Amino acid sequence: MKIGVYGASGRIGKLLLEELKGGYKGLALSSVFVRQKCETDFSSFSHAPLVTNDLKAFVRACECVIDFSLPKGVDNLLEALLECPKILVSGTTGLEKETLEKMQQLALKAPLLHAHNMSIGIMMLNQLAFLTSLKLKDADIEIIETHHNLKKDIPSGTALSLYETCAKARGYDEKNALITHREGLRSKESIGIAALRGGDVAGKHTIGFYLEGEYIELSHTATNRSIFAKGALEVALWLKDKAAKKYEINEMFG
């Protein structure tokens, strides 16, 4: 399958190019979208990709787009994909409502998956969080996320997805149960998220389930950002030959 990388100059984008250099499980890099000059030397790649700032040409040259860019960039990408539908794997966070609506429109034409975190470990953490939230009904739930000091969005998209998982399991009102700044006593049907920023931490997420006399913490730590690139490539492989639909990452585990 021919892969197009959108957001190639970012941290994950560069890792995607590295993983695709020799062909990842039969995947081939066919196109790279760049706004300015690309620093990557493609002479060592098994196939020379199309490197372009022409969005339509970029989309036409691939069968699947993997996106790790910025919210505005995703909006532009979706406009092109609605004209020329291709498989989409998107890991960009902080998307506006209008952009998400365009994504739903694309899902009528092509398979796509949008996730805040592409690591296999986070996929499992989500499933464990749902089960634990369901079983430990009296436990207070708190989430702590830690990232590098250059991360802009707070809380992280992954922390918000974990919150949504826990809130759904409990039947909480998702719009009102989230607490990111607490004063006074803790309300019963609430889930707090605390965000820490420092150094070069790739990502750590901990969900605490606090009972009287004991507590359980479920934690995931990313020690290498390559897991996000590899996870996105695995999603692309999984989406191949799937029907047009917006898929959830937990569906990969059946």
Curated annotation (Swiss-Prot):
Residues reported to bind NAD(+): 7-12, 91-93, 115-118
InterPro entries registered for this protein in UniProt: DapB_C (IPR022663), DapB_N (IPR000846), DapB_N_CS (IPR022664), DHDPR_bac (IPR023940), NAD(P)-bd_dom_sf (IPR036291)
Record-listed E.C. numbers: 1.17.1.8
Pathway: Amino-acid biosynthesis; L-lysine biosynthesis via DAP pathway; (S)-tetrahydrodipicolinate from L-aspartate: step 4/4
One MF annotation (Gene Ontology) recorded for this entry: NADP binding
GO CC, one annotated term: cytosol
GO process terms (BP): diaminopimelate biosynthetic process; lysine biosynthetic process via diaminopimelate
Subcellular location field: Cytoplasm
Binding site for (S)-2,3,4,5-tetrahydrodipicolinate: 148, 157-158
Alphabetical list of SUPFAM superfamilies matching this protein: Glyceraldehyde-3-phosphate dehydrogenase-like, C-terminal domain (SSF55347), NAD(P)-binding Rossmann-fold domains (SSF51735)
Pfam family, one: DapB_N
Active site: 147 (proton donor/acceptor), 151 (proton donor)
Record's catalysed reaction(s): (S)-2,3,4,5-tetrahydrodipicolinate + NAD(+) + H2O = (2S,4S)-4-hydroxy-2,3,4,5-tetrahydrodipicolinate + NADH + H(+); (S)-2,3,4,5-tetrahydrodipicolinate + NADP(+) + H2O = (2S,4S)-4-hydroxy-2,3,4,5-tetrahydrodipicolinate + NADPH + H(+)
Keywords for the protein's UniProt record, in alphabetical order: Amino-acid biosynthesis, Cytoplasm, Diaminopimelate biosynthesis, Lysine biosynthesis, NAD, NADP, Oxidoreductase
CDD domains: DHDPR_N
Positions that bind NADP(+): 35
Function, in words: Catalyzes the conversion of 4-hydroxy-tetrahydrodipicolinate (HTPA) to tetrahydrodipicolinate.
Family statement drawn from the similarity comment of this UniProt entry: Belongs to the DapB family.
Name the UniProt record assigns to this protein: 4-hydroxy-tetrahydrodipicolinate reductase
Organism encoding this protein: Helicobacter pylori (strain ATCC 700392 / 26695)
